[in-house]
């Protein structure tokens, strides 16, 4: 069994070599491997074994490895017993690209340690291992066939929760005595080295395997002495002995399968990585991995970490625990051993529970607290390791950078920024204050406070951005990459000045917020005034500072971004440092470009916020005015910043053009000088663009025109380079000093450039793309010509001596002007002080109503200020007022003073008022009012107020005027002159004071006028002298062009004034028309209102008439109903009478009707209608008259033409509205039917008697119908005349004529046949076998008018039916 294992071990060792071939060339011969016992095989003879080392060092080494490796060996017991998700494994075993790739890593297995051994050393070392270590079935070999294979497959620790507490407690305390020669890692090393979790596993596994190798010969001794075994027991042996033997075979199989999976994954990942890398790159990386080591404070170490609180046995400093690395996965940069803040990293062992105390370096062992191991699958860890191993960087290399962490400075910066923004964490003011407090405010107040809150909040963010730029990025670049201030200034120009300015502004905003807090609350506030702070921030010194600094910062924006991108591409240290800083929580994804952009845009945010504040501020308030002023100031700052940015962009564009210029390209000027591309950079760019140059042949040539400070360049592009254009042998460099710009006639896009140089005038015809471009170019060129320095080139320029003389004269002239201006100001100040003295004197005299002194003259245009005419007119009017006042008072005096009396003044003239200069009342010394009263009132004698003899007008020097000077007269007055009233004296003093002020103003104006006139005269003389010295033909042309431009401008101004006048006239006319239209609208409105009133009245009248008509209609309907009732009653009475009459007649005839027949013969009573139905009513009512003995004799034959006749009668009825006596008569006559006389004569034979009786009945029926109709017409029409006429027209029909009987009513039932012996009253006509059925008796239509004799003679006799 042991031989099989010995034979199997080299085979598995070889497999492990092929699986993970890691290079340990960097560790060969090192002190570290010598201390571990691995130095001898690489330098000794093949036959020498590692066991030849002294055994005295092994116990110390055992204790050391128990201290360093024991904390993690326990957690590797059951790495295959728990499964983790892929995502969790990836997260927990995350590797940093900056800490793995270029660091020489320790091997994972013992087999990998022997990869670099010499030829025979591998075999000898392996045999020594087998012979000295015993059988693998001992303590470490209980779980698998080989401890080497177990160490490879169980490289991931497991949670301590899976191990029972009794099994852990015996081995928690492991003694760690100091060991000589071994230098484990300490805190100072860990502070500068970023530790990855996978490296932790590598170091722990190697230490475990080395401890197994060196302690193989000690196991027998340790097993012999229980106490020693307990004191020197290794973690590897403890874990092997404490494990049960139930699942050993199963775990061994799992170990083998895990190893095979790792080998497969490794080969796959390696192939994928090596596909994208060149062999040279892989070779360089292998060399870098051998060369990169670092020794810190005497500790030669590799990367690793240790779980739980541990300390270095050499230096005594505590190890950096895994819990301290969890806050920053990128590692820590700490100096002087300061601890790092806690942050979780992808470690496999995390600190649980409370904080563990750090043990003393002199302690016997290390206390392990309650920790939990979180393990991942080995294949996922290996895959992640191989993916990041090829591209990672080593932090221990001198070519790499250190990693930032939140040291005390960063922590203080974080707290500072958080304290700044603590008050403005809410999104708006409505959410920052209490909800109840916000609801009590008005809507406008809430909106205003929201905008103010947004202003302060954005200011906090801006200050935070500036602090990040300066205190994070700039500080890191200075300390880590040793960037100079100039280099940092290229990235963040003037950032420190901007931070200072905005920090001060933010502090003032916070103060204003604190002042506006409600009493008893630290949240509720309403800021009433903010405009004053904005005005102070954007005006004065602060405003100028913001203009300057923002101009510099915004101008360098593009350059800073370009420089940052260049550094990011070329400097790998810079790239890594920026990446590490980006992981700071304080940065919050604010990169360098984002910071620069935010600072650049901040100045443009203020106008929007201030405008919104103004919209929610009440107009007319003080804050509204301040906000408006602040808005104007901000816009002015932005415009100036834009101008600086534009100037900077133009300079950048000029440098680009100069960079594209051909090195050999140059141009010769007319004066012989050469213009090269270096001369371009000494000037400023005004405008550049593509134009067309027209040649003499008429072709247009594309050129690039560049307008500089004093020249205009015409360039051409050739082979992607710019050269000076050469067209018609004209110089492409045009001087602006004598350039004239003219328009081309009939060409909207062309312009002439005329160079009036004495060496040779030239004219260029330039075309643009549009008329607007032409006008823009002409305007820019003209402004450049006006601002061009007045220097002549070549021999026509003034000599240096003459130029110096001219400059000296101009300097002296300016000095004279300044001195004169200073003296004028002194004169004005003296006169103002003199006026103040007068006022004080007047106040001392008791006058308190005097006006306050004003400035002697206002500033502005000297042509307006130095106009003394208005002042002189005002003074004359005041003098006339004083004269009239005094004359009005003295004219009421009763007498004049006597001539006697002493007087200190000059003799009075004859024209003066007698007695005025000498009043008999005593004078009051020092009284201003009394002295005024003694002054001569005449204008030509009045020179000023009393007690001011030094103040005189300019004409006081004229001979003879001395007697008119004011004098103070003190003489005893007479009793006859009354004293001046107090009111008069007060008014007089006020007028004299006003007159004095006007005269002082006049004097100051005259002084200023003199200075101004003399200065202008000297300037004109100087210009004339210079003009004579420089009078050349070119200057004359240029002066003529300027004069032409001035005239053109004057004409344009006149045209503009004319247009303005026309506009005013049009506006006035429009106002008149609008006023007239308004009046017309008012009149039309008045008329409309009148018409509305009339229409309203008419509507009311119509309503009344309609109501009256409705009332009359109802009365008429009522009367009509009564008439119908009366008609029906009359009809019933008539029918009753008719029935009685027939009954009476029938009673006389044989065979009376039975009673039931009489009852049936009673007709229904219904009123006749007006539409012709009255003809049928009597017919129906007369039906019983035909029922009797005669009716049975009639045959049952009816005439076929009876129905059409009735229909024709019915169709010819006249409507009721056209019913009258005349048309009724005509209608009845029109429907009469004529029968030949022969047919009628055949029926007259033996029936005269019956015909007479039936004719009489028909006549009575017809008469009764006509009577009813006539009564109805009389009721409706109410006309007696028509009644009489209708009665005369109803003449009786001749008895010999009979009307034919109408056909029987189809709705009436047929009567029963009478007896045969009854007499027949009907008649029958038999002609051609046709029988005429006798109809029931019916009334005949109205008879027609009898025919005349001639008609009877010409026609046959007919019978009318």
UniProtKB/Swiss-Prot annotation:
PROSITE patterns: DH_2, PH_DOMAIN, ZINC_FINGER_C2H2_2. GO terms for cellular component: apical part of cell; apical plasma membrane; cell junction; cytoskeleton; cytosol; extracellular exosome; plasma membrane. CDD domains: PH_ARHGEF18, RhoGEF. Expressed in all tissues tested with highest expression in kidney and pancreas. Weakly or not expressed in liver, skeletal muscle and testis. Isoform 1: Expressed in eosinophils. Isoform 2: Expressed in eosinophils. Isoform 3: Expressed in eosinophils. Isoform 4: Not detected in eosinophils. Residues 447-644 form the DH domain. Residues 64-73, 1254-1264 have a biased composition (Polar residues). InterPro entries: ARHGEF18_PH, DBL_dom_sf, DH_dom, PH-like_dom_sf, PH_16, PH_domain, Rho_GEF18, Znf_C2H2_type. Residues 33-88, 131-156, 244-292, 348-368, 893-980, 1143-1211, 1229-1264, 1277-1361 are annotated as: Disordered. It is linked to Retinitis pigmentosa 78: A form of retinitis pigmentosa, a retinal dystrophy belonging to the group of pigmentary retinopathies. Retinitis pigmentosa is characterized by retinal pigment deposits visible on fundus examination and primary loss of rod photoreceptor cells followed by secondary loss of cone photoreceptors. Patients typically have night vision blindness and loss of midperipheral visual field. As their condition progresses, they lose their far peripheral visual field and eventually central vision as well. RP78 inheritance is autosomal recessive. Interacts with SEPT9; the interaction may inhibit GEF activity. Interacts with Gbetagamma subunits GNB1 and GNG2. Interacts with EPB41L4B. Interacts with PATJ (via C-terminus). This is Rho guanine nucleotide exchange factor 18. The lineage of its organism: Eukaryota, Metazoa, Chordata, Craniata, Vertebrata.
């Amino acid at each position: 069994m042991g031989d099989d294992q010995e034979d199997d071990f080299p085979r598995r060792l070889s497999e492990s070599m092929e699986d993970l071939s890691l290079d340990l060339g960097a560790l060969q011969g090192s002190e570290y491997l010598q201390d571990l016992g691995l130095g001898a095989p690489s330098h000794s003879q093949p036959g020498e074994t590692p066991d030849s080392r002294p055994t005295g060092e092994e116990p110390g080494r055992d204790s050391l490895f128990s201290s360093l490796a024991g904390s993690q060996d326990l957690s590797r017991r059951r790495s295959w017993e728990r499964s983790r998700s892929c995502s969790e494994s990836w997260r927990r075993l995350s590797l940093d690209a900056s800490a793995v790739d270029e660091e020489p890593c320790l091997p994972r297995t013992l087999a990998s340690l022997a990869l670099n051994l010499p030829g025979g050393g591998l075999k000898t070392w392996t045999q020594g291992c087998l012979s000295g270590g015993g059988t693998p079935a001992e303590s470490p070999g209980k779980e698998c066939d080989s401890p080497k294979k177990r160490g490879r497959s169980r490289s991931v620790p497991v949670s301590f929760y899976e191990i029972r507490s009794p099994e852990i407690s015996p081995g928690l305390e492991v003694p760690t005595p100091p060991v000589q020669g071994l230098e484990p890692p300490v805190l100072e090393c860990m502070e500068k080295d970023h530790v990855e979790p996978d490296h932790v596993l590598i170091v722990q596994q190697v230490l475990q395997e080395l401890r197994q190798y060196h302690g193989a010969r000690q196991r027998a001794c340790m097993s012999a002495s229980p106490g020693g075994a307990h004191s020197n027991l290794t973690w590897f042996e403890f874990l092997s002995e404490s494990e049960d033997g139930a699942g050993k075979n199963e775990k061994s199989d799992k170990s083998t399968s895990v190893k095979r999976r790792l080998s497969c994954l490794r080969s796959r990942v390696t192939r994928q990585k090596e596909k994208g890398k060149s062999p040279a790159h892989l070779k360089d990386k292998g060399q870098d991995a051998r060369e990169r080591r670092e020794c810190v404070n005497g500790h030669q170490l590799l990367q690793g970490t240790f779980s739980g609180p541990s300390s270095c046995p050499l230096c005594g400093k505590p190890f950096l625990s895994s819990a301290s690395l969890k806050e920053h996965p990128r590692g820590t940069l700490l100096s002087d051993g300061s601890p790092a803040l806690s942050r979780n990293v992808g470690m496999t062992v995390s600190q649980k529970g409370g904080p563990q105390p750090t043990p003393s370096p002199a302690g016997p062992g290390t206390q392990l607290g309650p920790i939990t191991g979180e393990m991942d699958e080995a294949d996922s860890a290996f895959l992640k390791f191989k993916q990041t191993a090829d591209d990672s960087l080593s932090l221990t290399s001198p070519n790499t950078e250190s990693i930032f962490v939140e040291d005390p400075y960063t922590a203080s910066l974080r707290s500072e920024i958080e304290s700044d923004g603590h008050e403005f964490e809410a999104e708006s003011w409505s959410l920052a204050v209490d909800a109840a407090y916000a609801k009590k405010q008005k809507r406008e107040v809430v909106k205003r406070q929201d905008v103010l809150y947004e202003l302060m909040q954005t200011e906090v963010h801006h200050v935070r951005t500036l602090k990040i730029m300066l205190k994070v990025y700039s500080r890191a670049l200075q300390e880590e990459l040793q960037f100079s201030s100039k280099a940092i200034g290229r990235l963040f120009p003037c950032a420190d000045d901007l931070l200072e300015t905005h920090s001060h502004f933010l502090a003032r905003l916070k103060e204003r917020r604190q002042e506006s807090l409600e009493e008893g609350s630290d949240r509720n506030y309403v800021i009433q005034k903010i405009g004053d702070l904005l005005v102070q921030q954007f005006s004065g010194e602060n405003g100028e500072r913001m203009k300057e600094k923002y101009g510099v910062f915004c101008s360098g924006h593009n350059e800073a971004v370009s420089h940052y991108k260049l550094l990011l591409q070329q400097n790998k240290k810079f790239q890594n440092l920026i990446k590490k800083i980006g992981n700071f929580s304080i940065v919050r994804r604010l990169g360098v470009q984002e910071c620069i952009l935010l600072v650049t845009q901040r100045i443009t945010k203020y106008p929007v916020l201030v405008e919104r504040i103004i919209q929610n501020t009440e107009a007319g308030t003080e804050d509204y005015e301040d906000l408006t002023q602040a808005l104007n100031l901000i816009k002015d700052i932005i415009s100036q910043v834009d101008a600086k940015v534009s100037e900077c962009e133009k300079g950048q564009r000029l440098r680009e053009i100069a960079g594209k210029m051909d090195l050999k390209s140059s141009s010769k000027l007319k004066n012989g000088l050469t213009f090269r591309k270096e001369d371009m950079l000494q000037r400023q760019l005004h405008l550049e663009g593509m134009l067309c140059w027209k040649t003499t042949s008429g072709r247009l040539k594309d050129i690039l025109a560049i307008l500089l400070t004093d020249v205009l360049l015409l360039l051409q592009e050739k082979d992607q380079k710019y050269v000076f254009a050469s067209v018609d042998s004209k110089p492409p460099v045009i001087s602006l000093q004598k350039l004239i710009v003219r328009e081309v006639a009939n060409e909207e896009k062309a312009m002439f450039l005329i160079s009036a140089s004495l060496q040779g005038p030239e004219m260029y015809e330039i075309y643009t793309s549009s008329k607007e471009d032409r006008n823009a170019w002409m305007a820019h060129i003209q402004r450049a010509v006006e601002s061009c320095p007045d220097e002549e080139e070549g021999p026509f320029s003034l000599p240096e001596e003459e130029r110096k003389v001219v400059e000296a004269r101009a300097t002296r002239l300016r000095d004279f002007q300044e001195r004169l201006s200073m003296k004028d100001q002194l004169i004005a100040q003296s006169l103002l002080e003199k006026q103040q003295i007068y006022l004080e004197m007047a106040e001392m005299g008791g006058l308190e109503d005097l006006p306050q002194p004003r400035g002697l003259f206002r500033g502005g245009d000297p042509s307006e200020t130095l106009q003394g005419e208005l002042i002189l007119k005002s003074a004359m009017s005041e003098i006339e007022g004083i004269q009239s006042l005094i004359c009005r008072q003295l004219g009421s005096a009763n007498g004049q003073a006597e001539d006697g009396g002493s007087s200190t003044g000059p003799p009075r003239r004859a024209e003066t008022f007698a007695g005025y200069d000498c009043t008999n009342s005593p004078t009051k010394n020092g009284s201003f009012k009394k002295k005024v009263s003694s002054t001569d009132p005449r204008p030509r004698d009045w020179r000023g107020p009393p007690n001011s003899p030094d103040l005189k007008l300019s004409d006081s020097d004229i001979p003879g005027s001395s007697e008119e000077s004011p004098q103070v007269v003190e003489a005893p007055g007479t009793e006859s002159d009354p004293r001046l009233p107090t009111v008069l004296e007060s008014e007089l003093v006020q007028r004299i004071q006003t007159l004095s002020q006007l005269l002082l103003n006049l004097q100051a104006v005259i002084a200023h006028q003199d200075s101004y006139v003399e200065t202008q005269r000297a300037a004109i003389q100087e210009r004339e002298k210079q003009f004579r010295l420089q009078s050349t033909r070119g200057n004359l042309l240029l002066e003529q062009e300027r004069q032409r431009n001035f005239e053109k401008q004057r004409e344009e101004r006149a045209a503009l004034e004319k247009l303005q006048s026309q506009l005013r006239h049009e506006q006035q006319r429009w106002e008149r028309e609008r006023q007239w239209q308004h009046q017309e609208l008012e009149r039309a409105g008045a008329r409309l209102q009148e018409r509305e009133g009339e229409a309203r009245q008419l509507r009311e009248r119509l309503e009344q008439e309609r109501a009256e008509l409705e009332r009359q209609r109802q009365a008429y309907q009522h009367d009509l109903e009564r008439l119908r009732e009366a008609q029906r009653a009359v009809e019933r009475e008539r029918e009753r009478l008719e029935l009685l009459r027939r009954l009476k007649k029938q009673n006389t005839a044989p065979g009376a009707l039975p009673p039931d027949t009489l009852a049936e013969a009673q007709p229904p009573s219904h009123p006749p209608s007006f539409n012709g139905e009255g003809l049928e009513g009597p017919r129906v009512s007369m039906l019983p008259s035909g029922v009797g003995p005669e009716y049975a004799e009639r045959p049952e034959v009816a005439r076929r033409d009876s129905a059409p006749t009735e229909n024709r009668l019915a169709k010819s009825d006249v409507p009721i509205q056209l019913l009258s006596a005349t048309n009724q008569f005509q209608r009845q006559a029109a429907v009469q039917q004529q029968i030949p006389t022969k047919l009628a004569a055949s029926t007259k034979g033996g029936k005269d008697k019956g015909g007479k009786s039936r004719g009489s009945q028909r006549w009575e029926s017809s008469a009764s119908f006509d009577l009813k109709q006539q009564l109805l017409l009389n009721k409706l029409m109410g006309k007696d005349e028509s009644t009489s006429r209708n009665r005369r027209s109803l003449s009786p029909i001749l008895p010999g004529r009979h009307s034919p009987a109408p056909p029987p009513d189809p709705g009436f039932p047929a009567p029963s046949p009478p007896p045969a012996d009854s007499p027949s009253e009907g008649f029958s006509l038999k002609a051609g076998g046709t029988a005429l059925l006798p109809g029931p008796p019916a009334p005949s239509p109205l008879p027609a008018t009898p025919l005349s004799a001639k008609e009877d003679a010409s026609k046959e006799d007919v019978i009318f039916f």
